[in-house]
Amino acid sequence: MGQALRRLLKSGEAMTPISELMLFEAARAQLVQQVIRPFLDEGGVVIADRYTSSTMAYQGYGRGLDRELIERLDREATGGLKPDLTVFLDLPVEVALARKGGGPGDNFDDAPLDFHRRIHRGYSALAASDPKSWLVLDGQLPPEEISRQIWARVQTII
């Protein structure tokens, strides 16, 4: 389901914010039920590049949808499964967009600069609200230093 959603986003087809939210939640519910939970039940460790915090940042802060609604839908979609650690590589919005490059984007990549600023504020607010489960790093540090700091934190968890 996630792959189909990615194709839809890359198609450039206009989508209402609430439709976008519901599609992400449906894809997440399926992923958690079919892949993540069974893997965790077998003792596995899951590393994901997007989860509920991304939905809150993009749909809540970026698109302006009701954050309480997003929290409720996230809880339903995940069965309350939360990450032990969320890493936020904090970069100025302009730097992050420049790093993305000029290749083909999706509905998010092609959004106005203010949209990306709202998302950045969202991630910052989420990290500040739960500092024990977030690791905020300067995304302009050398990659080796970023890796070192992430690994040091991960080792305290696994």
Set out the residue ranges of the language-model regions.
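ATP-dependent small-molecule kinase phosphotransfer cores
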Residues: 1-78
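Alpha-helix N-cap/helix-start motif at coil-to-helix transitions, marked by capping-box chemistry
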Residues: 3, 90-91, 117
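A generic structural signal for alpha->beta connector loops
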Residues: 43-44, 83, 131-134
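Conserved phosphate-donor/acceptor-positioning beta-strand/loop module used by diverse small-molecule
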Residues: 48-50, 79-100
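Structural signal for conserved beta-strand scaffold positions within catalytic alpha/beta enzyme cores
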Residues: 72, 88, 136-138
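Arginine/glycine-rich "motif VI" loop of SF2 helicases in the C-terminal RecA-like domain
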Residues: 78-80, 128-129
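NTP-dependent small-molecule kinase module
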Residues: 94-158
